[in-house]
């Protein structure tokens, strides 16, 4: 029993050290390639990712019939492919687990496709919480 508890604790600690919890200013810097794309400002993205994933690059949210992955919570029904949804449209032509690492390059490429196809309203948090009063989402320490 003790070895099971030890193994469980090691597993939890290992997972915690792999997770990437970004700060507001880190997100601001990381998303510079999205500045103005689709008419969306950086403060809007900082706000949207905060309310979508809490700046956690390894955030996974399971819904009834789909799962959303990463900083941008990209859905496996349409945009990426995983074992849960092997018949996904996979418009971004990528495995969903690629959205769970610290390299946001592929995430941003997919986000641009989402913006081109459906716009910023794909992210419900944007319309509800991030379309005005954006001063708090600026980063002074660039």
From Swiss-Prot:
GO cellular component term of the entry, any: extracellular space
Residues reported to bind Ca(2+): 98, 101, 103, 106-107
Single Gene Ontology MF annotation: identical protein binding
Subcellular location: Secreted
Chief location category: secreted
Effect of residue 29 to Q: In an allele of Droughtmaster cattle; an Australian breed
Role: Regulatory subunit of lactose synthase, changes the substrate specificity of galactosyltransferase in the mammary gland making glucose a good acceptor substrate for this enzyme. This enables LS to synthesize lactose, the major carbohydrate component of milk. In other tissues, galactosyltransferase transfers galactose onto the N-acetylglucosamine of the oligosaccharide chains in glycoproteins.
Name of this protein: Alpha-lactalbumin
Organism: Bos taurus (Bovine)
